[in-house]
């Protein structure tokens, strides 16, 4: 059996017959199945195999249901790696990207993925991004785009600005560099205009994992509270403070300002201590990450008057946990009932006053903050009220005195889309000294990147130094002007590509007719790491496209699967150099050694496959040794799609052996003339039950369970004492059920045995009959003695423990192993095993 040869044969047949090419058929139910498209980094890896195979199984299954299936692939091709490769290899980024796309396309075809390749898109093509430039200008017209100077996340290695979502634990998401903070003029899109809609829209996404929705809710960060005016002592000015817990107002010990609050420059006396604090915040920023690492604060010369009791004065401090771009950039601190405030009070030796008591336990607020609800104390006229009652009473009182206003705030910030790099979509703006920022006229689009004379030095943006491209005439006054040299954040391209797949050759950004048929995406698949970047941006851009009448949907993805990662152990030699798995071998004692010098290697923990640690598996080698169907089956077996998968040679070899068994059994059936029409009721029941369960498993994306059920049916077929017509029919049903998982071999076996001319991929899904499933079904239970498998026992499904135990203790093989020893206990797992402890 030459699996690779079989796979190439069927891939050619599918391509020649355009099996997966689709068009809109209005009277046919559509299904749009889509994986997150990849960055063409060079080669596909086994992580890609898992993601795309999960998607492919669903697409093939939906096709077998008679649905019209759109399943497409493209390339998220802009980004820094191409620019870095251009610098290292002295080439143009497009050459590097094109070469990588050619390699990865062939790899994905070799896996047998059912894509409509006629819809392939690549985001670095001007035919793609011309629409993005027009869309940007449309948003500019609608007031959704603006430019301002702002404190930005600066990646010193990649030398570009990163969005907040791209800063992970204070480091650049791609380079890993510690982020710096700089004031730069940037372009922003007003995603905050859609904060409430994006938050409420999550409730409609019933097919999304709760974990992803929770992450987006936290990122949007809605909080309802009140802005309270505190009068500064001795100064004709006030500070507006945002609070979500106004009931704790009488427990306030301080007012905290952001280091860059406007009152700081106006009224705070500059001392060496305050200047040192301001300089530190300016250098390291006040991101949530930095706040979590270390909370710092400093007292100032200012005091405020308590709004509900003028005899109370509170000190004003500066602290890094107050963010100028959230709320008002000021808050009051109640150390007894807020953990963060408690830390600051301890640091500055400020008063800690309890104003809420628990009804359930004793609390000591000097030791730790009590953040729960309870009954108000030490709060004058609020004493005795519940926290809920007190909150509303304080809000009413503050509003009545015109010193408070209820507001809703969001942590979500506007999307900064400017990037100081070459390999991205040019921002279609021209800067003129007389006219300001002028949009490039539509007839002059696309603004294309220069293809010659670009110098990639690794420092700054090459577009700044490309004079023939940069210096142009103003479209309005025709005087000298300069192009915008920043390019779009690459998340812009991936925020609408799913709509382009509906018709990738349309003259419009989105073909309205095709989009009305295909959108939304019915099943989207990708990593959970995109929860608050790509997935949030795509939801936002979809709503903008809806408002601008491009499409008639408000949510892009009906259902979402976030597949787990593929893991592999890491290996290091005696010099702590990383080793590839194929550089390691097992010696006769079961120890791992380096093939090169036979020295022992250090085995690390299971980690996500990465080129830097060399714990990657060569996909081309896997396909060459085992074939695509084996790889597909392995990445789907044993582990649910949403869980991480450990790559193992033993596991993939086990799948290879099973597939060999399938093929050999098919050859056996082909070479025998079957005439026996005897019906085995157990096999009949098992076959129909398998159809039913596998169908439901695929619908619920329990693909590992589906494969387990298929293997169970095969085991029953294989164990039948004599071959019959019924066995062949059950085996052919098994092969049809296996088709989405191992499409090449299943097609080959079907063509060998069915005697029919159709391809499996064109046949409807098998149907079960409930009447057959009610027959009593036998199962095989494993018999273990002290945990070791000793025998097997066939019985009816759901046989009670007492009956199983009584029967197996009478078996000669079991009695032989027990001998004269006492049976201490039996561990019974229904329908699975019984373990006799002696």
From Swiss-Prot:
Record's subcellular location: Cytoplasm
EC identifiers of the protein: 6.1.1.4
EC class of the enzyme, as a word: ligase
Gene Ontology MF annotations: aminoacyl-tRNA deacylase activity; ATP binding; leucine-tRNA ligase activity
Swiss-Prot/TrEMBL keywords: Aminoacyl-tRNA synthetase, ATP-binding, Cytoplasm, Ligase, Nucleotide-binding, Protein biosynthesis
Residues passing through the membrane, by range: none
Residues the entry annotates as binding ATP: 611
Pfam families: Anticodon_1, tRNA-synt_1, tRNA-synt_1_2, tRNA-synt_1g
Motif ('HIGH' region): 38-48
Coiled coil: none
Residue numbers covered by motif 'KMSKS' region: 608-612
Reaction it catalyzes: tRNA(Leu) + L-leucine + ATP = L-leucyl-tRNA(Leu) + AMP + diphosphate
Major place of residence: cytoplasm
InterPro entries recorded: aa-tRNA-synth_Ia (IPR002300), Leu-tRNA-ligase (IPR002302), Leu_tRNA-synth_edit (IPR025709), M/V/L/I-tRNA-synth_anticd-bd (IPR013155), Methionyl/Leucyl_tRNA_Synth (IPR015413), Rossmann-like_a/b/a_fold (IPR014729), tRNAsynth_Ia_anticodon-bd (IPR009080), Val/Leu/Ile-tRNA-synth_edit (IPR009008)
GO biological-process terms attached to the record: leucyl-tRNA aminoacylation
GO CC annotation, single: cytoplasm
Homology family: Belongs to the class-I aminoacyl-tRNA synthetase family.
HAMAP family to which the protein is assigned, alphabetical: Leu_tRNA_synth_B
NCBIfam families: leuS_bact (TIGR00396)
Protein name in the entry: Leucine--tRNA ligase
